[in-house]
Amino acid sequence: EIALPGKRHLISDLEIRGEDTFRQSCGKDAHLLLLPNHSTHSDPEVMSEVTRRLGIRPSFMAAYDVFARGRVQAWIMQRTGAFSVDREGSDRKSMKCATNVLVEGRYPLIVFPEGNVYFCNDQVAPFAEGSSYIAMSAQKKLGMNNPVYVVPVSMKFTYLEDVRDHLRSSIRKIARRFETELDAEAEFGRELSRISTTAVSYTHLRAH
C-alpha cells in the first residue's frame, strides 16, 4: 500500500514503470544520481516511496528554505538523508557534500535538477547547472572504471475523476474578481490565458 495518505498529498496510488530495466542497468553497488522532474510539492515524498519500494535508501539535496519551515521538519529531513543547498548562490559546501555522496556510492543521490516546483506534468523546465557539475565532479574522482549512472525520473500525476467542472467553477470566481466572465463556449486554455492577462492588467491599473 502507498505510504502517502491524507489531505496534504491526496495521492491514493502509485505505479512504477521501468523497475526491471533500472535494476539490470545499475546494479547493487552503482553510483546513482536520480534526476526527477519537479511538478508538485509532494515530489520528495513520492520519491521516498519509490525508493522504499525499490529497496534503496536515498540521500536528498533540498533547498535550504525547506529546512527553515520548522525545526521538527528539519530534524526529520536531516535524519532521513537530506542536506540543504542554497539555490540562489554558489554553495560549494553542498556541492562538495553531494559529490562525496555520489563517490561513496552507499546511497543514491536524488536532485531535482529544475531547481523549483513548476507544476508542469508534461513539460520539463531547463535544468540548473548543479546536477551536471555534481555528476562530472564525482566521475572525475571515481575514474572511468567506476561509472556514475545518471537516471532521469519522470513523475506524472493524474486525477482519478474529471475535475474540469471544479476547475471551471474556480476560474469563473477568479474572473469575476477582475470584472470579466469565463466564456463557457471558448477553448478553456485560451480563456485561462485571457483571464490571466486581464488579471495582470487589472492589478497594474489599480496599483496606479
Name these PLM-found stretches:
Residues E1-S48, R71-A74, Q78-A82:
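Membrane-anchoring hydrophobic helices of lipid-metabolizing enzymes
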Residues T203-H208:
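Conserved small/polar residues in nucleotide/adenosyl-binding loops
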Residues E45-R52, A135-A138:
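Histidine-anchored nucleotide/phosphate-binding helix
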Residues S90-K93:
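Glycine-rich anion/phosphate-binding loops
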Residues F60-Y64:
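Short internal beta-strands
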Residues V103-R164, E191, I195:
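Membrane-associated lipid acylation/remodeling enzymes share a hydrophobic transmembrane-juxtamembrane segment
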Residues K173-A184:
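Acidic, His- and aromatic-enriched active-site or binding-groove loops in soluble protein domains
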